[in-house]
C-alpha cells in the first residue's frame, strides 16, 4: 500500500488553484468556485475546496480537468510547482 511521505500534503494542485482563483478580479470566492464547478458537473462544496487548497484532500484526475476548465487554465498549470507570489 502506498504511504504518502509528504506529511499533510495530499496534492500539489491546491496552492495553484487558490492562487488562480484569487487572481480573478473581483476575487472569486471558494463558494463561487464551487458554484461554477457544479455547472461543469462537479459537486464540491466550499469546505472541500478549502481542504483541496490547503493540501488536506486528494484531487482526482477528473476533478483536475474540471478545475482547469472552470478556471480557464491548463491541467499542467494546476500540477506544476506551486505558483510563486
Outline where the language-model segments fall.
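A short, Lys/Arg-rich alpha-helix, primarily the initiator
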Residues: 1-26
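Short, charged recognition helix plus adjacent turn
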Residues: 2-7, 69, 76-85
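DNA major-groove recognition helix of helix-turn-helix/homeodomain DNA-binding modules
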Residues: 36, 60-77
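DNA major-groove recognition helix of helix-turn-helix
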Residues: 53, 63, 79-82
Amino acid at each position: 500500500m502506498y504511504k504518502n511521505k509528504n506529511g499533510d500534503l495530499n496534492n500539489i494542485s491546491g496552492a495553484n488553484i487558490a492562487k488562480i482563483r484569487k487572481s480573478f478580479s473581483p476575487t472569486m470566492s471558494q463558494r463561487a468556485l464551487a458554484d461554477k464547478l457544479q455547472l461543469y458537473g462537479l459537486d464540491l462544496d466550499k469546505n472541500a475546496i478549502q481542504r483541496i487548497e490547503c493540501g488536506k484532500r486528494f484531487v482526482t484526475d477528473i476533478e483536475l480537468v474540471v478545475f482547469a476548465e472552470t478556471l480557464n487554465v491548463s491541467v499542467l498549470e494546476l500540477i506544476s510547482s506551486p505558483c510563486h507570489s
